[in-house]
Amino acid sequence: MSEAEPTATLCFVDTNIWLYAFISGPDAAKSNLARQLLRDSEEALVVSSQVINEVCVNLLKKAHVPEVEIQDLVRSFYRKYPVVLLDQAVQVSASELRGRFSLSFWDSLILAAAVHCGATILYSEDLQAGLEVDGHLTIRNPFAS
């Protein structure tokens, strides 16, 4: 993505996008694209507590990031971005979305959190790119050509 989304557009970013940005691995192209997306959309980004948890557990297990850095990262997420908590409304919405779209439990929570915060774009490598939800949220795969 070469231009930033307008600041009125809220963008929810799924876990794998964050992980590509944080971990330099064998797929440098995806890492670079993820970093660019996060930079370009920084003012419009929204995350959920689930995404923060998933990022942290993967950084601990796969990248062996020290706990002190994980603590700093958690604080940074909460300081820099709106964080959607997985409350009753989000969980009930996730259940409804699972029924409508045949999603996994965890993917439905991601989608419900994105809908709940009013995001218009959900960046995800895992969910169905192009899917429109309730007429205002579109799933985009930032790595698709």
What do the predicted segments below correspond to?
Residues 3, 82-122:
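Active-site neighborhoods of divalent-metal-dependent phosphate/nucleic-acid chemistry enzymes
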Residues 1-6, 111-145:
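Acidic, PIN/NYN-like endoribonuclease modules and their adjacent C-terminal/linker elements
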Residues 73-76, 81-87, 91-92, 100, ...:
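Short acidic, glycine/proline-enriched helix-loop-strand junctions
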Residues 45-50, 124:
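Substrate-recognition element of Asp-dependent hydrolases with the DxDx(T/V) motif
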Residues 1-47, 62-72:
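Short, well-structured N-terminal submotif of metal-dependent ribonuclease cores
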Residues 54-82:
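Active-site-proximal, substrate-binding regions of enzyme catalytic domains
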